[in-house]
């Protein structure tokens, strides 16, 4: 059964438009609370479950936090409020505090006028599809407030930020520190604006910050992992050794070196796999996505590392990692999973893992990626009407077939619907940039004509 509200990363949309409205989010909190309260762990003991709510810095977070809190309380679920907190911080604290679930109010890399809700299970993982389906089923039932003696209570979690800072630092090798390194940290005016600079500073780095002055409206606005030009300029202007850019909820990153070169998630995955081979002797396999650059796949296979592609979305990378019993996976967008360190993608932890790999090897990122030249990719986002039947369109199919025939095995064509926005993503990868651009633009033109 198709889900009505949950996408690849929770529920997301424009604030004020269904489903991101206070009345719906209150009912969502109630529905999630009823599902949690009915779970075996809590139903058998009769204990009242507790959930943790964190958020990013969007002005709408206050409204949605209050709505969620009310819904959970009406379902008889206690609430702990973490305030502004990176998504991976909520996942960690949920697991560390043995809570029933964690909830994040964020639209990640989207503009301030969007927002969303995503859930984490007690073990710090994103909720399975079947639990999200149970919540959707509960949404169809009437809201029946728990008796007064069973209503949930709410309280602030003291030092949530400090607890998460210590967790992040604990993932960095005790033998290393960052003394002598000048580091620019771009927090996208988002959830990590306070914690990320502290992590790198307390490990010894000379930290220069940008994107650390949230006002409720400037999250991801010209800064952060989706706008890395700001980081490139800051690294060059300050003659820094390296720059790290996080997105609005800090679950992904981009890294820039002293020369202004940008490194994406595909390249950083290769660096981390190399580091594991050097320290452990062997890495059985790694997981990317349908969008992962072919050059990385070839380079990993040349090192004897099996490579598997998952559907786009970090939850699907995680599923493949668990299926194969592996630890390392990534998306080119900068979501990096290292399951021996954390249960979910964490931009701060991922940056520390890359820095540790550089220190262990004594080499720069450019040197660690010698011999790995990414194939040119052209990605075009085409807005379309929700529900448009692009898969069954003959004109689109012909355009794809013609491009694949012209590439003749020296590239790839990938078209997919976004799980978070009403757009169709057209990606072409080729040995030569002009070919990637030509075929992507041609297919995108056909898609626009067919879906408008």
Curated annotation (Swiss-Prot):
Mg(2+) binds at residues 108, 247, 249, 251. This is Phosphoglucosamine mutase. InterPro entries: A-D-PHexomutase_a/b/a-I (IPR005844), A-D-PHexomutase_a/b/a-I/II/III (IPR016055), A-D-PHexomutase_a/b/a-II (IPR005845), A-D-PHexomutase_a/b/a-III (IPR005846), A-D-PHexomutase_C (IPR005843), A-D-PHexomutase_C_sf (IPR036900), A-D-PHexomutase_CS (IPR016066), Alpha-D-phosphohexomutase_SF (IPR005841). Binds 1 Mg(2+) ion per subunit. The active site is at 108 (phosphoserine intermediate). Keywords: Isomerase, Magnesium, Metal-binding, Phosphoprotein. Signal peptide: none annotated. GO terms for biological process: carbohydrate metabolic process; peptidoglycan biosynthetic process; UDP-N-acetylglucosamine biosynthetic process. GO terms for molecular function: magnesium ion binding; phosphoglucosamine mutase activity; phosphomannomutase activity. Its cofactor is Mg(2+).
